[in-house]
Amino acid sequence: MQGRSLLFAILRIAVATSLLGVAQFCAGQFIPASPPIADPNDKRFDAESEDWSSPALDKSHLTPVPPLSSGIAVKSNCSVEMVRLQWRFGDPIDVYVMKPKGVEKPPVVLYLFGHTADTDLFRDEHFEQGSTRDGFAAVGFVSALAGPRFHDRPITQWFVSELPESLATSAHDVQMILDYLAKRGDLDMTRVGMFAQDSGASVAILAAAVDPRIKVLDVIDPWGDWPDWLAHSPVVPDGERPRYTTPEFLNKLTGLDPMSWLPKVQGKVRVQNALFVPGTPPEAREKLLAAVPAGGTVVVYKTPTDTQEILQNNQILQWIHQGLAQLPPSDIAKLPSLPAAGKKAGALRP
């Protein structure tokens, strides 16, 4: 039942992000901006610089301040710790670290969902139990300009209006979070996976392409092929679309297109695509699927019914867990053996 609840939560996010994103943004025009978080007297990040033209960190200079922990909550089969990380002025990031009981240095999966996602999911008991089942750790956080990370800026700004910033900083965050996790010393950082959806899937592709520490990548409905996506995606309000299809705006995205970076991912890759979720235009969707590197897996769900197999058999995380379990472990306790993955609905590639 835990796996089923986990799948419902993930699919709910996928559908809500694509179908309700515009409605939520429009409604947001009438909601007062959140209170300021950034302290103008905070000089800790004055020397930092960041390159928004690339997902790579080689031209950026980000130095983290000491992490702040909320303490560890011990649950029935896992522990949960919220850690606040920061390496950018006015942008603290709440990272949820969920660890299974009884496993020393477990492999870890990072979770990043769409631009309307909040951190509530990472405090959900079903998610905590389902994501740590089978001896895997889970690390959840949200993208730039999402959830608690939207503050100190005009309410008319959002993930897409600031797309170069949103993509680049979020991809940088993934790498900085991996650095933090490596310093903890309680996770197997030789076996790292990332599970992401929608805009989060785009960020995950960018990060995995430049950071080989991500050994297994499982993404659902990634955005990409920016000229076509911005021109035709229903996520973009028609009244704003002309702003995002100008050469000036598109030029800023040249080095941030998941379609270009996906073939460069070195780890194991699976791209899942739900045709009934309309966030990505058909032509852009096809180009993204065609960009999956050789040996990668593509799964297409034509209707919600096609998801019943993974729903009934609790397989939503089985593929990424198996991929990590097949990698040689570092100095960790042996994981329980996992069942063979079931037949993938609508699989186009082995």
Where are these regions (language model features)?
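Cap/lid segment of the alpha/beta-hydrolase catalytic domain
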Residues: G114-H172, W229-H232
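Gly/Ser-rich "nucleophile elbow"/oxyanion-hole loop immediately N-terminal to the catalytic nucleophile
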Residues: T156-D198
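Alpha/beta-hydrolase
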Residues: L110-L112, F141-S143, I220, Y301
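Hydrolase active-site cap/lid region
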Residues: A201-E248, L311
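N-terminal cap/lid segment of alpha/beta-hydrolase-fold proteins
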Residues: K59-V103
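C-terminal catalytic histidine-bearing segment of alpha/beta-hydrolase fold enzymes
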Residues: P293-P350
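The feature captures the conserved acid-bearing segment of alpha/beta-hydrolase catalytic domains
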Residues: P234, D238-E286, A290
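Short beta-strand element of the alpha/beta-hydrolase
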Residues: V95, K105-G114
